């Protein structure tokens, strides 16, 4: 009997490294992505085309993409904030572009200075351009299990944003517990609400491990049919709302949990550990101000 397959979307090179207080050299980013690919991870978010003034850590995304090895059967994804970012991503050869919205009005206004409805309207031209260029479009929804400003977020609010993203043309919607406050019961309620308006096959889960419940939340949602999980190698990326606390759940932990549950991921644990060791070692040198040009590549 063939094991049920769960696809891990590796977000470390973008969502993880963009939160670093230092600029990570292009060589390190490329070396990390090469190792992730060798570990069997074929869905990799490699960067973003957001203004360098806002996210300087991602300013070299075009240079990173120009050096990436072929990814047959997989996709290199990038985050885009607007049509200008999309055009840059297309020119760089992105295999997928991602757009983002919030399930919390307060977070939307604090993060991108507009309402949820306005943010979705702004992405309509991006969705149209992606459709015309036959580039797959992914959607992110933040604060699905809690907001740093509003507190509790209702599942129905999450479902409506997810529905709108799919209506725009997103083939997949990733639901993010941005501040890592969710519980398994809350996660199940959220997935159930979204699955009522979006096919569960198009739902991904993006958990942060701020309070140590990410794996429990993922496990609860797997039982409801979720088959796509976002994670970051070595748990890259902290939580901006809880300094010093973990952010993204570690890919190593997710892969081990799925393997123990008898679920197939296609990930080689030893190669994944090598990728984690590579990036943590490189980051330690960068943070210390050391030259990484001779770092093992």
Tell what function each PLM region has.
Residues 1-297:
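Catalytic cores and adjacent flexible loops of soluble metabolic enzymes
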């Amino acid at each position: 009997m063939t094991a049920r397959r769960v696809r891990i979307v590796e977000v470390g090179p973008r969502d993880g490294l963009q939160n670093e207080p230092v600029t990570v050299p292009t060589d390190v980013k490329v070396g990390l992505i090469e190792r992730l690919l060798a570990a069997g991870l074929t869905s990799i978010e490699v960067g973003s085309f957001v203004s360098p003034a806002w996210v300087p850590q991602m300013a070299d995304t075009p240079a990173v993409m120009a050096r990436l090895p072929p990814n047959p059967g997989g996709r290199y994804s990038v985050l885009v904030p607007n049509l200008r970012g999309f055009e840059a991503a297309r020119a760089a050869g992105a295999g997928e572009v991602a757009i983002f919205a919030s399930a919390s009005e307060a977070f939307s206004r604090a993060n991108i200075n507009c309402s949820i409805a306005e943010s979705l309207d702004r992405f309509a031209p991006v969705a149209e351009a992606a459709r015309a260029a036959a580039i797959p479009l992914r959607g992110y929804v933040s604060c699905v299990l809690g907001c740093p400003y509003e507190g509790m977020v209702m599942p129905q609010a999450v479902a409506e944003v997810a529905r709108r993203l799919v209506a725009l043309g997103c083939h997949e919607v990733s639901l993010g517990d941005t501040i890592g406050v969710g519980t398994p019961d809350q996660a199940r309620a959220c997935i159930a609400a979204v699955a009522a308006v979006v096919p569960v096959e198009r739902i991904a889960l993006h958990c942060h491990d701020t309070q140590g419940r990410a794996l429990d939340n993922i496990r609860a949602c797997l039982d409801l049919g979720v088959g796509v999980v976002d994670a970051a190698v070595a748990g890259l990326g902290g939580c901006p709302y809880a300094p010093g606390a973990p952010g993204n759940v570690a890919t190593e932990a997710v892969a081990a949990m799925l393997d123990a549950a008898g679920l197939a991921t296609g990930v080689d644990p030893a190669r994944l550990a090598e990728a984690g060791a590579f990036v943590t070692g490189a980051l330690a040198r960068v943070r210390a101000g050391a030259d990484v040009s001779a770092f093992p590549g």
